[in-house]
Every structure is written in structure tokens, then in C-alpha cells.
Regions:
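A generic short alpha-helical patch detector that favors 3-5-residue windows
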Residues: 1, 51, 55, 74-78, ...
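Short linear motifs at protein or domain termini
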Residues: 1-92, 217-219
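Juxtamembrane/interface motifs at transmembrane-helix termini
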Residues: 41-42, 93-95, 119-123, 172-176, ...
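Short alpha-helical transmembrane interface motifs in multi-pass membrane proteins
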Residues: 68-69, 166-169
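Conserved amphipathic alpha-helical segments that form helical-bundle/coiled-coil interaction surfaces
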Residues: 92, 96-167, 180-189, 197-208
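Short arginine-rich
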Residues: 207-216
Length: 219
């Protein structure tokens, strides 16, 4: 139950359903999600570790302010350090099953982007969320194939922080097609079996994400 509530609140935070700076009342959230207060309290405590919400002794849980440019730079630097190394290791461990899993993740992302593009002018908040989930799934597939459990744990913490980029953006998703094209380049690089080629493709992707994210940040 806590896992379900966590993801429901995460989606509400990233989509802007819960407004920045507002106090998150456990009783009201429990009523909205039709659950008891306990899983809401547990989910908020977990969300506090991501930086999406913060806890103050007398106010309770509130939505955190958006990332500033220094925080974004630090986060993207962490991505470069972890993800470039991870794809290098995954490339060394590469096998047909891994590439098939990555192709499947990419196909899911492709369909999500197409669905979002066809309906984004009519709202499409849930479709935008599916694009974000599919994007992360692609990266998780790489982490899962490093053969290193600690890298996988680090990836989970990193993914939670990446949601703050979306939360901090001025509006929705603006780079879904760019990210898809870059993921296609990453898969093509992995198919070469050349670690250096794969690492360069990932570094290029992260650099581009950082540049686009800087443009999307609120001042």
C-alpha cells in the first residue's frame, strides 16, 4: 500500500497537482487517495529523502522549492559520474537479452512519446507522466545490467532526484522527442560493443539534458 501511495503522490508532485510551498496535510491526502493516514505518512517520509518534499517540526510536510541552477549542475554532474560508468560496465556485460530488454524499453518510450504528442494540446498530463516513467525505465535497464547491486541502489536514489528536474520546470515536458532520439543513439552505440562509443553516447545525452533543463528552470 505504501508503494502505491508513494507513486501516486510522486505523480501529483511532478505534475504540479500539489502546488509548491503548500502544506501537505496527511488527513486530506489520505481522503483523496482513499487510504488510511499511515501509508501516506510513510510515503511522505520516503519522499522527503528525494528532496521533493521537506519536513519541518511545526509545519509538517511541505513541497520543496524548485531546484536552482547550482543544484541542477551538481545533479547532472552526479549523473555523468554514475551513468557513464554504468553504461560502460553494461556494455562489457552486454548480451542479446540485455539489448532486447533495452529495445523493449525504447519501444515503450517511443509509444509513450507518440501518444503524448498526439494529445498534449488537450491536456495529456497522464500521458506526460507515462513518458517520464518510460524514460526512466530505459536508464534503469542499463543500471540493472551492470551486474553491480550497489550501482542499482545508487540509481534508485538518483532517479528520485531526477523527478525534481521535472518538478522545477516551468511547464510539462518539452524534450520528449530529443530524449527519445538520444536513447536510440545510445542503443545503437551499445550494439557496436565498443565501451568508449557507448560512454560517449551517454555523456552526450546527459550534457544535452542538462542544457535543456537549464532552459526550463524557473528563475
Amino acid at each position: 500500500m505504501t508503494e502505491h501511495v508513494y507513486h501516486a503522490l510522486l505523480q501529483m508532485l511532478v505534475q504540479g497537482v500539489l502546488k509548491r510551498g503548500s502544506v501537505l496535510r496527511i488527513d486530506l491526502l489520505a481522503k483523496t487517495l482513499d487510504v488510511s493516514p499511515t501509508p501516506v505518512r510513510e510515503a511522505l517520509a520516503r519522499l522527503a529523502t528525494t528532496g521533493l518534499v521537506q519536513h519541518e517540526a511545526r509545519r509538517g510536510y511541505t513541497i520543496a522549492p524548485p531546484l536552482d541552477r547550482k543544484q541542477l549542475a551538481e545533479l547532472m554532474d552526479a549523473r555523468r559520474l554514475i551513468e557513464v560508468a554504468a553504461i560502460g560496465r553494461a556494455c562489457e556485460n552486454g548480451c542479446a537479452a540485455f539489448l532486447a530488454d533495452l529495445e523493449k524499453a525504447l519501444d515503450t518510450q517511443r509509444k509513450a512519446v507518440e501518444a503524448y504528442q498526439s494529445q498534449k494540446d488537450e491536456g495529456g498530463e497522464d500521458l506526460a507522466w507515462q513518458v517520464m516513467v518510460a524514460d526512466l525505465r530505459f536508464h534503469h535497464t542499463i543500471f540493472e545490467n551492470t551486474g553491480n547491486r550497489f550501482i542499482r541502489v545508487m540509481s534508485q536514489a538518483l532517479s528520485a532526484q531526477l523527478h525534481r528536474i521535472r518538478q522545477s520546470a516551468q511547464a510539462g515536458i518539452s524534450d520528449d522527442r530529443n530524449a527519445l532520439e538520444e536513447h536510440e543513439e545510445i542503443l545503437a552505440a551499445l550494439r557496436t560493443g565498443d565501451r568508449a562509443v557507448a560512454e560517449r553516447a551517454m555523456e552526450k545525452h546527459i550534457n544535452n539534458v542538462e542544457r535543456r533543463s537549464e532552459l526550463d528552470l524557473t528563475d
